[in-house]
């Protein structure tokens, strides 16, 4: 195990204390920047903390502050205000995926025992039906709604009433002492809601992840917040980490505008899933090739890496045009949620933008391991956090096993589902369902997902993610999944690659027969793999795969 130099992190026991520390230290610093109705907005740490007090006081007036409160909608300042408001109570925040079907939303609201729903305008059309099918909800509060009607309230008026009550001396919300051992965040895992489980996270879980994550990977003054807030990766590793660090959070308004907003806000760091890093990587090389500079770029990377070995770092100058494309201030991209291709990590590190790869899962709040700033190997997902014990279960002769985690970040269990909880939590160890290896330096390598495992009829086990990484190296492949080919009796006899190709890249590369070309290129890309891991069938899709809200392909 290497000697790791940990960052000094200011300790805190609760999210409420963390916010009080921020206001004490940087009251007038900008906490949030965002666009609303085509107008730029800025909110200081003091103003944000006051807004949470106003919303919290309004909830106290309804006697709902210790209850289950759901929120659904696009990433927004109002969404985050409700989020932090509830984290400072003894109630429970239920973030709901805005991409769920109406029926699935109803199931989540019922299963979570939510009694208040904060919602975006898109869901106004469902409120009357929710009233009939979600009997426990007592109040609906619309972010864009202008007027109150019975128990359907305007958020602006709701916050205003809370402010008036607070300023008249109602300090009940402010006097709450959170019990950090109790359920605070109830997050429903992605998937069909019939199978979705409510992951119970305590405040202690959240505090552990924020504190120990910052020990190994620091953040900087400005970030762009991109990923959906109902996912713990962004809600905890993105938002709470930034607030602890007193960073300015710039809220991305649309996934299609990420590069545009990087130019607008000029962030120093950003949290992403690998799909975004893949797009950025291919865009850089595509631009280089279209301008005839791809060979020069390759040479510059080699020269830069040689110079760095003798202590000369010219990356900011050598790759100035690339840095300018990313706002000219980007220092770090933190990638989680799925494995990232090794060559992408090495490329960004070579040009002077640190790509830090980590591993997390909702049930672990979510961070389990991450590459350290000073000990970064993008082919791994780094070392476990200091609050984490990690082991591999049922290890194969190749050294692979199921990743099991114990520590302060591990969930309390699944909400109202003791059977499923017992299946994955055994003697304090959480069985993740992910498989991996641990190298000689103690770093974790993810090899695949248990549920994706392909067992061939010859008894060989294949993790499709490994082969997909090779295929994604083909420049005009936009998306791929590898799956088993079943015979008449259901046995998996071989491997099929289902691919979606980039029409733009096909035209740019002047590929006349994409169907033939992709089969040839996949054969070449996987030639070094064992025979049983090679592709025997290729299917070309005419449209993209269906994806989750964090841009992961639904298998």
Task: Give a label for each model feature.
Residues 27-30, 142, 163-188, 195, ...:
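Conserved pre-ATP/AMP-binding loop-to-beta segment of ANL
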Residues 41-42, 56-100, 270, 314-444, 450-453, 478:
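Conserved AMP-binding/adenylate-forming
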Residues 42-46, 184-210:
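Conserved AMP-binding A3 loop
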Residues 88-161, 503:
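Structural core segment of the AMP-binding/adenylate-forming
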Residues 143-144, 478-479, 490, 523-552:
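AMP-binding/adenylate-forming catalytic domain of the ANL superfamily
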Residues 207-225, 229-320, 354:
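Conserved AMP-binding/adenylation subdomain of ANL enzymes
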């Amino acid at each position: 195990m290497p000697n790791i130099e940990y960052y000094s992190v200011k300790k805190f026991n609760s999210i409420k204390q963390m916010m009080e520390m921020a206001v004490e230290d940087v009251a007038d610093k900008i906490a949030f920047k965002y666009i609303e109705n085509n107008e730029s907005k800025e909110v200081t740490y003091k103003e944000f903390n006051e807004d949470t007090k106003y919303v919290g006081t309004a909830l106290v007036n309804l006697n709902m502050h210790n209850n289950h409160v759901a929120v659904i909608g696009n990433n927004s300042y109002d969404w985050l205000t409700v989020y932090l408001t509830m984290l400072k109570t003894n109630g429970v925040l239920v973030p709901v995926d805005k991409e769920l079907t109406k029926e699935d939303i109803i199931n989540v609201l019922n299963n979570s025992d939510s009694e208040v729903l904060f919602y975006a305008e898109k869901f106004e059309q469902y409120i009357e039906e929710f009233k009939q099918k979600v009997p426990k909800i007592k109040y609906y509060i619309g972010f864009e709604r202008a007027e109150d009607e019975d128990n359907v309230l305007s958020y602006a008026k709701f916050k205003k009433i809370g402010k008036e009550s607070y300023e008249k001396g109602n300090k009940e919300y402010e006097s709450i002492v959170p019990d950090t051992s109790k359920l605070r965040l109830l997050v429903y895992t992605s998937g069909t809601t019939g199978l979705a489980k409510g992951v119970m996270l305590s405040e202690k879980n959240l505090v552990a992840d924020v504190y120990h994550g910052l020990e190994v990977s620091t953040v900087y003054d400005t970030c762009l917040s991109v990923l959906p807030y109902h996912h713990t990766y962004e809600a905890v590793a993105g938002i709470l980490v930034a607030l602890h660090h007193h960073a300015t959070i710039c809220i991305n308004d649309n996934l299609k505008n990420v590069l545009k907003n990087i130019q607008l806000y000029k962030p120093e760091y950003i949290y992403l899933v690998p799909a975004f890093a893949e797009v950025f990587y291919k865009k850089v090389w595509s631009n280089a090739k279209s301008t005839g500079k791809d060979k020069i770029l390759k040479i510059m990377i080699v020269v830069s890496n040689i110079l760095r070995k003798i202590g000369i770092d010219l990356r900011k100058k050598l790759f100035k045009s690339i840095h300018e494309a990313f706002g000219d201030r980007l220092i770090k991209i933190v990638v989680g949620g799925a494995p990232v291709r090794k060559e992408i990590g090495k490329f960004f590190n070579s040009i002077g933008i640190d790509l830090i790869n980590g591993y997390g899962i909702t049930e672990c709040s979510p961070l389990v391991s991450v590459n350290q700033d000073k000990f970064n190997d993008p082919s791994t997902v780094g070392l476990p956090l200091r609050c984490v014990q990690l082991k591999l279960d049922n290890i194969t002769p190749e050294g692979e096993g199921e990743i099991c985690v114990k520590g302060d970040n591990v969930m309390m269990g699944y909400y109202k589902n003791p059977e499923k909880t017992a299946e994955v939590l055994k003697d304090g160890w959480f069985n993740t369902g992910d498989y991996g290896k641990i190298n000689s330096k103690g770093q974790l390598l993810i090899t695949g997902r248990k549920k994706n495992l392909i067992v061939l009829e010859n008894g060989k086990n294949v993790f499709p993610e490994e082969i997909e990484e090779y295929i994604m190296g083909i420049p005009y492949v936009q998306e791929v999944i590898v799956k088993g080919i079943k015979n008449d009796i259901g046995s998996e006899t071989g491997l099929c690659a289902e691919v979606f190709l980039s029409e733009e890249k096909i035209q740019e590369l002047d590929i006349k027969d994409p169907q033939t070309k992709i089969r040839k290129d996949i054969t070449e890309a996987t030639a070094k793999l064992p025979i049983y891991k090679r592709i025997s069938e290729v299917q070309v899709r005419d449209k993209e795969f269906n994806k989750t809200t964090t841009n992961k392909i639904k298998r």
